């Protein structure tokens, strides 16, 4: 890996975002990216392997979500894969209690390796199907997020039993999020959930458009 190129790209991206990172956070992101590329040679973790694209499309993208979170919240990342956004969120907000879940054991092994390497406290990677958490982690999370995991309806159906009172679901989507939201309206209504806000944004360095879709249970009033 070109350590300098990754670091320079991430610094340029976060400067454009006006998201300040400490030297230690930059180092941790760099180590994460290095391990991601190394493990990806033998485990299918990501299709994004260019140093600059890892900096922007994995790290910077996760930082837009970090702006929606509070360090006192407990967060679940569903279908976490290589630990994205869970690990970048944990690096960006050290006090955030973070749990990731994925059904592929090798991906969870990678996440646990990175957590040990970076000495992440308050981070847990679970090898499980999301449905299996209903019995053990019901109503446990303030925020549940996913990136490229499923459509909005299935995301809500699988995660709603895990959401704490007053919590919210945040789906990381592409530029067609509005269309997907319209398609999911009937399903969301049947599940007694609603979209409460959309947060469209542009990735730095002209790297594409994304959108955060925030959903909550419908008030029982």
Curated annotation (Swiss-Prot):
Binding locations of S-adenosyl-L-methionine = 79, 130-131, 147
Gene Ontology annotations for the cellular component aspect, listed alphabetically: cytosol
From the record, give the transmembrane residue ranges.
none
The reaction(s) catalysed by this protein are: guanosine(527) in 16S rRNA + S-adenosyl-L-methionine = N(7)-methylguanosine(527) in 16S rRNA + S-adenosyl-L-homocysteine
Question: InterPro entries this protein is in?
Answer: rRNA_ssu_MeTfrase_G, SAM-dependent_MTases_sf
Question: Could you tell me which cysteines form disulfide bridges?
Answer: none
Q: What GO molecular functions are on record for this protein?
A: rRNA (guanine-N7-)-methyltransferase activity
**CDD domains given in the database record:** AdoMet_MTases (cd02440)
- Keyword line: Cytoplasm, Methyltransferase, rRNA processing, S-adenosyl-L-methionine, Transferase
Q: Where's it found, cell-wise?
A: Cytoplasm
What broad class of enzyme is this? transferase
- Its name, as the record gives it, is Ribosomal RNA small subunit methyltransferase G
Q: What is the lineage of its organism?
A: Bacteria, Pseudomonadati, Thermodesulfobacteriota, Desulfuromonadia, Desulfuromonadales
Gene designation per UniProt: rsmG
């Amino acid at each position: 890996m070109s350590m300098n190129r990754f670091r320079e790209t991430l610094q340029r991206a976060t400067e454009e975002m006006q998201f300040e990172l400490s030297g230690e956070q930059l180092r941790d992101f760099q180590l994460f990216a290095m391990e991601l590329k190394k493990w990806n040679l033998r485990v299918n973790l990501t299709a994004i392997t260019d140093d600059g694209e890892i900096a922007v499309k994995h790290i910077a993208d996760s930082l837009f979500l970090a702006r929606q979170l509070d360090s006192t919240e407990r967060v679940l990342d569903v279908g976490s894969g290589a630990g994205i956004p869970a690990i970048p969120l944990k690096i960006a907000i050290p006090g955030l209690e973070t749990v990731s879940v994925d059904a592929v054991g090798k991906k969870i092994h990678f996440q646990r390796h990175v957590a040990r390497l970076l000495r992440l406290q308050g981070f847990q990677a679970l090898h499980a199907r999301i449905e299996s958490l209903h019995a053990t982690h019901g109503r446990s999370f303030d925020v549940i997020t996913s990136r490229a995991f499923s459509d909005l309806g299935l995301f809500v159906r699988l995660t709603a039993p895990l959401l704490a009172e007053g919590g919210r679901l945040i789906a990381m989507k592409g530029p067609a999020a509005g269309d997907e939201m319209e398609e999911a309206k009937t399903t969301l209504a049947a599940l007694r959930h609603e979209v409460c806000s959309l947060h469209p944004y542009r990735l730095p360095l002209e790297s594409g458009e994304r959108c955060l879709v925030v959903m909550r249970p419908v008030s029982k009033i």
